[in-house]
């Protein structure tokens, strides 16, 4: 199987997001890279499942709270931006202040 660079990035993001989700489920507070991976992978999946851009942006702001991340991480994450594949093509999705 041959994967393009973009496909490899998406796969790595998915794997990092899965690891972060498992840690979150066990009650482990997420660090910065885990936080970004968790949010980004959920945004990718939401877009793939057919949500609109606006719905994905709103959804992204509901995924994590300050209690889910290590101290200081919420203040470091001002936005999460991804290129997501929607049924009608690839679009840029930005979630501002995703940890509330």
From Swiss-Prot:
Q: Which Pfam family is one of those matched by this entry?
A: Urease_gamma
Q: Name one GO cellular component term.
A: cytoplasm
GO terms of molecular function: nickel cation binding; urease activity
Question: Which reaction is recorded as catalysed by this protein?
Answer: urea + 2 H2O + H(+) = hydrogencarbonate + 2 NH4(+)
Q: Which terms does the UniProt entry file under GO BP? A: urea catabolic process
Residues spanning the signal sequence:
none
Keywords assigned by UniProt, alphabetized: Cytoplasm, Hydrolase
- Localisation: Cytoplasm
InterPro entries (UniProt xref):
Urease_gamma, Urease_gamma/gamma-beta_su, Urease_gamma_sf, Urease_subunit
Query: If you read the UniProt record, what top EC class would you report for this enzyme, in one word?
Result: hydrolase
Q: What is its main location?
A: cytoplasm
**Recorded E.C. number(s)?**
3.5.1.5
Pathway in which the depicted protein is active: Nitrogen metabolism; urea degradation; CO(2) and NH(3) from urea (urease route): step 1/1
Self-association state and partner proteins as the record states: Heterotrimer of UreA (gamma), UreB (beta) and UreC (alpha) subunits. Three heterotrimers associate to form the active enzyme.
The cross-references to NCBIfam families, in alphabetical order and at most eight, read:
PRK13241.1, urease_gam
Per the record, the similarity remark reads: Belongs to the urease gamma subunit family.
Show the HAMAP family listed in the entry.
Answer: Urease_gamma
The record's listing under PANTHER family reads: UREASE (PTHR33569:SF1)
Kindly provide the name given to this protein in its UniProt entry: Urease subunit gamma
Organism from which the protein derives: Haemophilus influenzae (strain ATCC 51907 / DSM 11121 / KW20 / Rd)
